[in-house]
Amino acid sequence: MFKALLLENQDGKTVPTLTRLAESQLPEGEVRVAVAYSSINYKDGLAITGKGKIVRQWPLVPGIDFAGTVLESADSRYQSGDKVVLTGWGVGEGHWGGMAEQARVKGDWLVPLPAGLDERQAMCIGTAGLTAMLCVLALEEAGITPDSGEVLVTGAAGGVGATSVALLAALGYQVAALTGRPEEQGAMLTALGASRIVPRSELLVPAKPLEKQLWAAAIDTVGSQVLAKLLAQMNYGGAVAACGLAGGFDLPTSVMPFILRNVRLQGVDSVMCPFERRQLAWQRLARNLPASFFEQAVTEIGLEQVVEAAEAITQGQIAGRTLVKL
């Protein structure tokens, strides 16, 4: 038997219960893992509180990412005792996730934990950090180098944004960090490596088809008006990695930046990212993230506190990462 947080649907309402489950109750999969850490993401908050239509299977153990040790495996890539990390693939939505002492998943969904990272550090990175690394890889593959010019990161105080700032700065890029709370978040972003802070209000003005060229590249987590504005401000040959829609899913832009300035807009998805790409990204995270990244605000909680933390994250009351220690 092992401890787990189980979500059930009772008369249309999501009811979370701390319970004990038997191994036989775990869903099908090739690899059974002893979970060491999970984390609370915004999507987890929506699932656990029932505020968003996230859960696709009842009952469900939530938790969209986790790290731990293989207990048994029918996949030749993994042996008992191996350290692994999981993000994405609909885990914690349509397949039982990381908010339990054990999980059983497909081998294809796991990635071996790279040398230099432990389970706690892996969850400090989590889904957000993997997405950030995939964005950085996209910019590198578009030919953007530290000599290309300034790189803008939007939503810089969020999980993806903050990790993007840290990675780019560690790789030698000049980073401008866009945030809606410059006074509150400026010091943290500077500590992560941002060379300057840009108030979000500067990019909320409606964009002309083309504007003054300001950015060599950008990582955008916001979408909508902000993405349209920065596209109009990209340098000739610039590249934007777009991975979020915190500001909306619309894009009020024109073809002008693409056909007159040779700008590249690259979409980045981490949920269905193939195994080889994930493995590369995790290896790069282990190599490129500075030690100082793991010293930022991190709160550790137990399963007993997850429901309270889920409510808090949906109300914007959580700063930094919240890890769940199993």
Go through the PLM ranges and name each one.
Residues 65, 82-83, 102, 150, ...:
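Residue-level marker of beta-strand positions
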Residues 87-152:
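NAD(P)H dinucleotide-binding glycine-rich loop of Rossmann-like/cofactor-binding domains
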Residues 24-40, 51-91:
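Glycine-rich beta-strand-centered segment in the early N-terminal region that forms part
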Residues 129-130, 155-162, 223:
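Glycine-rich NAD(P) Rossmann-fold beta1-alpha1 loop
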Residues 279-326:
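C-terminal hydrophobic helical "lid"/dimerization subdomain
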